[in-house]
Amino acid sequence: MGGGERYNIPAPQSRNVSKNQQQLNRQKTKEQNSQMKIVHKKKERGHGYNSSAAAWQAMQNGGKNKNFPNNQSWNSSLSGPRLLFKSQANQNYAGAKFSEPPSPSVLPKPPSHWVPVSFNPSDKEIMTFQLKTLLKVQV
């Protein structure tokens, strides 16, 4: 997990070399060191495998993978998706069925102060109209 090793390649230097020449030599050694690190990292990640060549080959094949033959038994087993869920459809589902409304006896009763105790038929009609308007149900 540690960092890559640093390769220092000694460059022959003479004592009378100008500063520009020394800077060039330093740049060359840095470039060589960075190239060695890049090669080392590529080998670690891809184990020396060239991924761009594989991508180019896949593109040339038109996206078709030639490594896997067309297996008819595999395709026929997936041809009917209903067969995959057939065993599950026969089992009873214990959850709520949302297609059927719950019976009024199961529903909780509203607090007494929400609803007046006595209703006139006209009050019920007005309340029904108001509820349908609020819920945007066609009257």
UniProtKB/Swiss-Prot annotation:
Residues 11-36, 61-79 have a biased composition (Polar residues). InterPro entries: PNRC-like_rgn, PNRC1/2. It comes from the Eukaryota. Keywords: Activator, Cytoplasm, Nonsense-mediated mRNA decay, Nucleus, Transcription, Transcription regulation. Residues 1-51, 61-80, 89-110 are annotated as: Disordered. Expressed in heart, lung, muscle and brain. The keyword Transmembrane does not apply. The keyword Transferase does not apply. GO terms for cellular component: cytosol; Golgi apparatus; nucleoplasm; nucleus; P-body. Disulfide bonds: none annotated. One of its GO terms (biological process) is deadenylation-independent decapping of nuclear-transcribed mRNA. It is found in: Nucleus; Cytoplasm, P-body. A motif (SH3-binding) lies at residues 99-105. Residues 101-110 have a biased composition (Pro residues). Changing residue 114 to A: Abolishes the interaction with DCP1A. Interacts with UPF1/RENT1; preferentially interacts with hyperphosphorylated form. Interacts with DCP1A. Interacts with many nuclear receptors including ESR1, ESRRA, ESRRG, NR3C1/GR, NR5A1, PGR, TR, RAR and RXR. Belongs to the PNRC family. PNRC2 subfamily. Involved in nonsense-mediated mRNA decay (NMD) by acting as a bridge between the mRNA decapping complex and the NMD machinery. May act by targeting the NMD machinery to the P-body and recruiting the decapping machinery to aberrant mRNAs. Required for UPF1/RENT1 localization to the P-body. Plays a role in glucocorticoid receptor-mediated mRNA degradation by interacting with the glucocorticoid receptor NR3C1 in a ligand-dependent manner when it is bound to the 5' UTR of target mRNAs and recruiting the RNA helicase UPF1 and the mRNA-decapping enzyme DCP1A, leading to RNA decay. The interaction between PNRC2 and nuclear receptors is dependent on the SH3 binding motif. This is Proline-rich nuclear receptor coactivator 2. The gene is PNRC2.
